[in-house]
Regions:
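Short, solvent-exposed loop/turn segments at conserved positions within beta-propeller repeat blades
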Residues: 80-85, 126-127, 175-182, 221-224, ...
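Beta-rich, blade/repeat-based domains predominating
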Residues: 57-72, 85, 104-122, 149-167, ...
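Short loop/turn segments that connect beta-strands within beta-propeller blades
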Residues: 91-96, 135-139, 187-192, 230-235, ...
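A short helix->beta-strand "capping" segment at the edge of beta-propeller domains
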Residues: 33-60, 240-241
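Secretory targeting and sorting signals
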Residues: 1-29
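Blade-level signature of beta-propeller repeat domains, shared across WD40, Kelch, NHL, RCC1
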Residues: 299-340
Length: 340
């Protein structure tokens, strides 16, 4: 999700502050920017298609949460879509066509991921604090979780599932006030038991399990850092530490995806690009657009890597509209790089 000081999300009724980030890297043809840490390899992304235009009612469009369904179609959420326009789109990346998958009169959805437990697709609604689920065909909407956790409502941003189907959510509570009140929350797969795993965080945004499900990576938007939560067998925290400090310049950390080799793909709001790190914190590469394509684009919020292959699709947005771009990832896609 993107951050107010870089681009305010004005005109969204009932939406306090949506912080929707992009990806920070060096611009094509320019010297490496801050935070390259020797990772001077460039993964060049190419445009697939424009999916959305800025909405008249909200003044912008912001794509997020790309996730492949079982038929190989790519689902994408449009965070700022008003009532009556597609809030989740289904894309045929081969034919370069899209269609409405879901819309409603309530949600500002910031992420999407299929549950390994019931096969439904789960969406985080940043505005209401709810987590909703849909049938695989986009129908049968249900509220999976709603209400306060430890006396405070959520602003759920991204989500990740463990192997059993329990949810782990980045809660950006406190972001609109500029206060470090954010949390990482675990919700059991029944939706009845919610536990705070970490708190006092600065607008947590991206969240993903590592390649072997031993722990969680999560990013903090306003601190430009990635932390690691080592989990025990019960899914609670064994330890927590700052793992990577991202020198993004004007860019801020957004969503995280993890490939089969454990590499992290970190979105940075403020630049339409993405930074790639190893699990040991080494900067490996920068995903960037051709220089001619960067005008009118401000963020590359998230990425889905094709399961079992290396073709990756990232969501890129700005005043010029919402786009899909593609590049070759460093390793194959797995669940941790498919939604969230």
């Amino acid at each position: 999700m993107r951050r107010l000081p870089i681009r305010p999300l004005a005109g969204l009724a009932g939406l306090a502050v949506l912080a929707l980030t992009g990806c920070g890297t060096q611009t094509a043809g320019a010297p490496a920017g801050p935070g390259t840490d020797g990772g001077d390899r460039t993964l060049r992304a190419q445009q697939v298609m424009r999916l959305t235009q800025p909405h008249e009612q909200t003044g912008m469009t912001l794509l997020e949460g790309p996730v492949f369904d079982k038929d190989g179609k790519l689902l994408v959420v449009d965070v700022t879509a008003p009532t009556g326009e597609p809030k989740v789109l289904r894309v045929n990346v081969r034919k370069k066509t899209s269609e409405q998958f879901h819309t409603d009169d309530r949600g500002n959805y910031t992420s999407a991921q299929f549950s390994p437990y019931d096969g439904r697709i789960y969406l985080t609604d940043f505005s209401s604090g709810d987590i909703v689920s849909l049938a695989p065909d986009g129908g049968d909407p249900r509220t999976f979780f709603s209400g306060e956790i430890d006396g405070a409502p959520m602003n759920p941003d991204d989500l990740a599932f463990d192997r059993e189907g329990n949810l782990y959510v980045s809660d950006s509570r406190g972001m609109s006030e500029g206060e470090a009140k954010g949390r990482v929350v675990r919700i059991d797969r029944s939706g009845k038991d919610a536990t705070v795993l970490a708190d006092g965080l600065a607008a947590p945004n991206g969240i993903s399990f590592d390649a072997d499900y031993r722990g969680l990576w999560f990013s903090e938007l306003t601190q430009n850092r990635i932390s690691y939560l080592l989990l025990d067998e019960e899914g609670t925290v064994a330890s927590q530490h700052t793992a990577i400090r991202v020198d993004g310049g004007i860019a801020q950390t957004d969503s995280i995806a993890v490939d089969a080799d454990g590499n992290l793909y970190q979105g940075l709001h403020g630049r339409p690009a993405m930074a790639v790190y190893s699990k040991n914190g080494e900067r490996l590469a920068t995903v960037e657009l051709p220089a001619r394509a960067t005008d009118g684009l401000e963020s590359a919020t998230n990425v889905a890597i094709t399961p079992g292959a290396t073709r990756a699709y990232m969501t890129v947005s700005g005043p010029d509209g919402g786009y899909l771009y593609t590049f070759d990832a460093l390793a194959e896609g797995v669940r941790q790089s498919n939604g969230g």
